[in-house]
Amino acid sequence: MKLLIALWAFAIGLMVPLQGVINAKLGKEVGGPTQSSLISFSGGFLIFVIIGLFNYQNLPSFSKVISLPPYLLSGGVIGSIFVLSSIVVIPQIGATGFTALIVAGQLISTIIFDHYGIMGLQVKPINTLRIVGVILLFSGVILVNRN
């Protein structure tokens, strides 16, 4: 079971840079990053409207959603910032550089999240191997971004 989850995560990892490259190209075609982001998120919104139509009985009530802590509703905002940023940054530094920096940022933040058990995550303390991994990753980021 864990192998399937790992393969799924790997496949998503393959798609993240593809999303950025597609959105950057779309931005050039439609006049800019804001327009491209709007089109991109409209497509995603449409998919979830369709899914919601088939799974409407499991949707939370409006009162439940508005009673949630605001930070729990920030995922869409963060996703919007990511998409807009990829459209602007990828043409400047390339998909590889962008992805390397994204992964480096993700690794740093997730090590901190795990170390402190943020939002109920299982606590996984920072250790020497994790620090060495971060150093190696940042070395790779520097090498990938060198001309």
What are these regions (language model features)?
Residues 43-47, 101-116, 135:
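Alpha-helical transmembrane segments of compact multi-pass small-molecule transporters, enriched
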Residues 36, 89, 116-118:
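Hydrophobic/aromatic residues within transmembrane alpha-helices
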Residues 39, 101-102, 129-132:
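Hydrophobic core positions of alpha-helical segments in small-molecule transporters
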Residues 29-32, 85-101:
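Structural motif at transmembrane-helix junctions in multi-pass transporters
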Residues 14-18, 22, 66-93, 143:
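Hydrophobic alpha-helical transmembrane segments of multi-pass membrane transport proteins
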Residues 1-11, 25-28, 33-34, 42-71, ...:
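Membrane-interface interhelical linkers
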Residues 10, 14-18, 46, 77, ...:
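Hydrophobic/aromatic residues within the transmembrane alpha-helices of Major Facilitator Superfamily
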Residues 127-145:
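Hydrophobic transmembrane alpha-helices of multi-pass small-molecule transport proteins
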